[in-house]
Structures are given as C-alpha cells and as structure tokens.
Amino acid sequence: SNVIAGVRSAAAELSDSGGSAAASAIMTTDTYAKEAVAHGTGFTVGGMAKGSGMIHPQLATMLAVLTTDYPLEAGEAIEFLRPAVDTSFNAISVDGECSTNDTVILLANGASGVARTPETDEEFAASVRKVCGELAKHIVVDGEGATVLAQIAVRHAMSEPEARAIAERVATSPLVKTALYGHDANWGRIAAAAGSAKFNGGFAHLDPDRLSIAIDDVPVLVDGRPTGDEPPLTNGHCAIEIDLALGDGSANYLTTDLSYDYVKINAEYRT
C-alpha cells in the first residue's frame, strides 16, 4: 500500500521540468545528481542515472533512464541501447562488486515526428551512445571515495574480447587502484594485472617482451623494458595505455582509485 501511495503521489507531481527532481530522488550514496542530454536534428535524447558504489558490468547498484522523442517501433529500442551500453555502462568499474538490481531503460514517445532515414537512425544511435557515455563517466567520477578517474586503453591485443578481459582485470586490480590513490606510476602492477587476465579457461595472450605501457602519455615500459620515467599523477585523472603488439584487439575502460574513504564509507554503511 505504501508503494501504491508513493506512485500516486509521484504521478501527481509529473511535469515537463521534473527531470532534475527525479535525478535527485534516486540518489543513494551519490554526491550529486547525474544527468546528460544530446540534441539531434529535430529530436532529443536525455538521461539520468544513479550509482556510486557496487559498480561493475552486468549486475550492480546502478539505475539509468533515458528518454527520447525520436520515433521508434515497439521492440526497436534495444537495437540502439545495447551497443551503447556495451561501451559505456558495461565498461566501467568502481569496486568490482555486484548486486542484483541494475537497470538501464530507454523510453521513446515519438513526439518529435521526425521522418526516419538511415542517416537519422545513425544520428540517434550516436546520441544514445553520447548520453550513455556521459552518464557512465559521471558514475565513475562520483565513485565512493574516488579521488582519481582512470581511463584504461588496451591496444593491439590478440582479439577484442581479450582486450576487454585485460582492461577489466587492470580496472579491478586492488594493487593498481591503490597505486593510483598513492599517485604511484607503478607499471609493474599494471603489467602483472594484464598478465593475469583470465580468458576462455586460460589467460589472455601477452608477450612480456612486446608489452608497452604509457601513463599520461609518458612511456614507462617499452617492449618489456622500463624507461625510468615516472609521470606525477597529481591532477585527479590518469590515462593508462597498454599496447600488447599482438593483433588488432582494443578496449577502453573507466575505473577509479581505491581510497581510505571507500573503506570508511562501506565500513560504516548499515542496511
């Protein structure tokens, strides 16, 4: 009865300007409301999301709702949403932890009346990707206790699935994440994590003598040999590029550091 009453109360407050209020209402440990928008030719895609901890692909405490006035037929939304989710919400991790209630929804009412063509469909797909990407980045930036946003790029892996496995392994490595918190350009931890990425019952291909790593565009390992250079990592952002020199596979991932505050937040949290 409380749920029904709550739904009725919320419905009574529906308005054209209610999006920001809704984005604030769904917050839990978030420190700010997360919204994004993309304007296409005659249509709009907007979105809101919540999430800060227990963020990892497939099952996490994340909610995202996208709305659009682009005309879609029943069942078509997934064709645009799934590819966008695969490169955004399914390519982020704050703590590698999972739950059972993540949701990404795309709602379309067709109110724009735009005449659909292959070109407008592609523009719409790009708009959905943009909104998903911005919301996913907001979630990582606002990760529980996060002080560093890390962008991980894996290049020239044996295949794209292997590149993704390596990127995810590095993104979820506690040793890599604590090194980020300590502003330590520790290529050894990155290489060790990459080399232990599980794939197809074994491990992703990696040749230590061909491995190169750059941190904030500074080469720290080239063909398996350390350069001795050490970027400062002091601006709250870190770009890690891992080049395996084995094939054409590539993948991108967003993650955070692991701080004292993350431990404090989750040690004090009670359900």
Can you say where each PLM-predicted feature lies in the sequence?
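A structural signal for small-residue-enriched, beta-sheet-centric alpha/beta enzyme cores
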Residues: 1-271
